[in-house]
């Protein structure tokens, strides 16, 4: 970066941006009352106007993580998300169009609208690993493996409503037309459970 190791406090240009050198022990920002004021002023100077929120929101591919703080210094409003989500914290993997995250709560979601190649059948969430996936013109087959004496709940994205579902175990299924996802539930087997879906 070309900045001397013992450079004095200040702003140094690097590439298309800047580097701020702060010669202060980071623990002082949290140990002293209002110790963060200096750091916040520097951040505001670097980025312009700061926007304070009571939540953290992070997207990584189709995964969404959100947490709302209950330290109502900023706001005690819940975070509300709209779209088509699978709630990954709920073992029943429900589909939701509106997700409300209250102060003191967290959410871990799968954003169905963010799926690439949404017309290709694929398992979006499951309590198993899928092997030997085979995608046909009007079919999708795979083997689901997971430890014995555990229940499998999975949400599968399909191009159309299934006409036939074959599972090598007793199962329950439910179609969600808005998200084009099939909810499948059955008991796991370590040697695998074969699933075949046709539409």
Annotated model-derived regions:
Residues 66, 142, 165:
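Hydrophobic, well-ordered secondary-structure elements that form the walls
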Residues 60, 136, 176-178, 189:
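Structural motif
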Residues 71-74, 80-83, 147-150, 157-163, ...:
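Short proline/glycine-enriched turn/loop motifs at strand-loop junctions of beta-rich domains
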Residues 1-137, 154:
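A conserved amphipathic helix/loop scaffold
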Residues 187-199:
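Surface-exposed interaction regions enriched in Ser/Thr/Asp/Glu
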Residues 135-152:
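Proteolytic processing hotspots in large secreted/extracellular or virion-associated proteins
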Residues 82-98, 166-185:
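Solvent-exposed beta-strand/loop surfaces of large extracellular or lumenal domains
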Residues 96-99, 131, 142-144, 183-187:
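Beta-strand-rich interaction surfaces with strong enrichment in secreted/lumenal proteins
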């Amino acid at each position: 970066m070309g900045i001397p190791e013992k450079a004095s406090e200040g702003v140094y240009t690097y590439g298309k941006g800047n580097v701020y050198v702060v010669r202060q022990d980071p623990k002082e920002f949290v140990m002293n009352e209002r110790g963060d004021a200096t750091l916040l002023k520097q951040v505001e100077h670097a980025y312009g106007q700061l926007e304070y929120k009571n939540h953290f929101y992070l997207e990584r591919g189709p995964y969404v993580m959100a947490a709302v703080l209950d330290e109502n210094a900023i706001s005690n409003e819940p975070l509300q998300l709209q779209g088509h989500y699978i709630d990954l914290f709920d073992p029943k993997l429900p589909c939701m169009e509106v997700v409300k995250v209250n102060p003191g709560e967290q959410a871990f979601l799968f954003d169905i609208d963010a799926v690439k190649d949404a017309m290709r059948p694929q398992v979006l969430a499951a309590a198993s690993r899928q092997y030997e996936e085979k995608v046909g013109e009007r079919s999708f087959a795979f083997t689901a493996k997971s430890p014995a004496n555990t229940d499998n709940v999975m949400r599968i994205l399909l191009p159309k409503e299934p006409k036939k579902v074959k599972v090598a175990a007793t199962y329950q299924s439910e179609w969600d037309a808005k998200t084009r996802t099939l909810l499948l539930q059955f008991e796991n087997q370590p040697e695998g459970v074969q699933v075949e879906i046709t539409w």
